[in-house]
Structure formats: C-alpha cells, structure tokens
UniProtKB/Swiss-Prot annotation:
A monovalent cation. Ammonium or potassium. K(+) binds at D121. GO terms for biological process: coenzyme A biosynthetic process. It is an enzyme of class 2 (transferase). Its main location: cytoplasm. Belongs to the type III pantothenate kinase family. This is Type III pantothenate kinase. HAMAP family: Pantothen_kinase_3. It comes from Ectopseudomonas mendocina (strain ymp) (Pseudomonas mendocina). The lineage of its organism: Bacteria, Pseudomonadati, Pseudomonadota, Gammaproteobacteria, Pseudomonadales. Gene3D superfamilies: 3.30.420.40. Pathway: Cofactor biosynthesis; coenzyme A biosynthesis; CoA from (R)-pantothenate: step 1/5. Catalyzes the phosphorylation of pantothenate (Pan), the first step in CoA biosynthesis. The keyword Plastid does not apply.
C-alpha cells in the first residue's frame, strides 16, 4: 500500500492507495502530526511506500519524514521543485519559488484535461494557474482564502466574533446579511466568487480554442455552482504527486 501526504499550512491531508493507484483504501484530514499517526494506526493498513508534498518549513518537513521512517519502516519520497515534469513547463522566472502544492495541482489538472486548463485551489489561500494546450505554465494569481479573510476581520475588528457553526449557517444563502456573521461570511464568499469569475474571463481570453476548469481545495464546493463547467477534484494534488514522484 502507498501512503500519500499533502502537508499544508493548516492541515495534513492523507490517503492510502493500492500499489497500482487504482483503489483508495482509506483517507482523512488531520491537524497535526500526532493526529496523522493516530489515524494511520486506527486504519489498520500496512504501508509499504510513502510519498509526500509539503509547504511546511524544511525543518518541519524533515521532522515528519524522520518520524514516518521510524514509525512505519518505509522510505519517504518528497516532491521537489522542477522546471519541467509530465509534459508541463514551470512558468515562474525562478521555478523553485513556485509553491509545491500549486505545481502538483496544475500538473494534475493538465494530466486529467490533456489540453489548456485553469486550475483553482481554494484553501487557506486561493491560487489560480493557467496552463496552455502545449503544457506551458503561464503563471497565476494568489489571494486570501475564506479562512484568511475571516481571520483578518476578526483580528482587526473587535466586534466581529462568532463560531464555526454560525459561519456555516450564514453560507446557506447569499442574500444581504441581517447579522454581522451573515454579512461577513457572505461578503467574503462573494469576493471569492468574484476572483474565480475573473480567472474564468482571463482563461476564455487566453484559450479561445477551449479549456478545462478544475477546482480543488477545502472550499471548492462553495464556488462550484458559480462555475458549472468546472470539475471538482478534491485529490488533484495527489494526482500531480503521482506524476512527480512515481513509485515502481
């Protein structure tokens, strides 16, 4: 079995797949290294190989890799920056500066679409990347995601305070808010949708011959109905990870 890890800024997304990658055995999201090992122990699955992508610091990533090797007895393959992989050419002036999660997501999108594509990852931050039909990464955009927008308002505005349940309830519709929670949550979501709409407009201009749209990340479902042509692929980073780090 192969353990795949996507170590983000706030959470670790994990899944165990069959050796050929065709079957997902189990999966989950945890908020700490301890939570990861508890989840793996509870799954009862024996892992033979492991590959991961991390946007953590080098020290934090190395600490996790060391623990994985000691606890699971496996070698760990880590995704690295590259100028070209899987038919896609990195579009950054300095390819090492492109976030690994973005790189893998656009690799995954191009692999699935097999033509020009727009890849939007809606997490703590929101990223949008454009890939041409011949695999040229044309660059992209980054903006705060819902968690960051929400946190900034609560941090810098004393009277904005509400819990997660209230936030979720506020997003059931997008009418003008009749409470602070509704006004904040709906306003932030409308900003997010506006960002995505602009990416679509740019993609239509850049790719007159047609393109695919891929949404991924924890908040992808919140903009799905605004982008009916999009494919929501929760594991898009893992699709790219398999391309960047093949395991024989």
């Amino acid at each position: 079995m192969i353990l795949e890890l996507d170590c983000g800024n706030s959470f670790i997304k994990w899944r165990v797949i069959s050796p050929g990658g065709r079957e997902r055995i189990c999966a989950g999201i945890v908020d700490s290294d301890d939570g990861l090992f508890e989840a793996l122990a509870g799954s009862g699955v024996k892992v033979q190989r492991c590959r991961l992508v991390s946007v953590r610091s080098d020290a934090e990533t190395e600490q996790l890799v060391t623990r994985l090797k000691a606890s699971l007895g496996v070698e760990v393959v880590c995704a690295q920056s590259s100028s070209q992989v899987g038919g896609v050419r990195n579009g950054y002036h300095d390819y090492q500066r492109l976030g690994l999660d973005r790189w893998l997501a656009l690799l995954g999108g191009y692999h699935l679409g097999q033509r020009a594509c727009l890849v939007v990852d809606l997490g703590t931050a929101v990223t949008a990347d454009f890939v041409s039909a011949d695999g040229e990464h044309l660059g992209g955009f980054i903006c705060p995601g819902l968690p960051l927008m929400r946190d900034q308002l609560s941090t810098h505005t004393r009277r904005i305070r509400y819990d997660r349940e209230v936030a979720l309830a506020a997003l059931q519709e997008l009418e003008p808010g009749r409470s602070t929670a509704e006004a904040v949550e709906r306003g932030c979501l409308l900003m997010l949708r506006g960002f995505v709409a602009e990416q679509l407009a740019q993609a239509r201009s850049r790719f007159p011959g047609g393109f695919e749209v891929f949404l991924t990340g924890g908040d992808a479902e919140l903009v799905r109905d605004a982008v009916p042509e999009a494919q929501v692929v929760p594991d898009l980073v893992f699709v790219g990870l398999a391309i960047a780090c093949p395991l024989s």
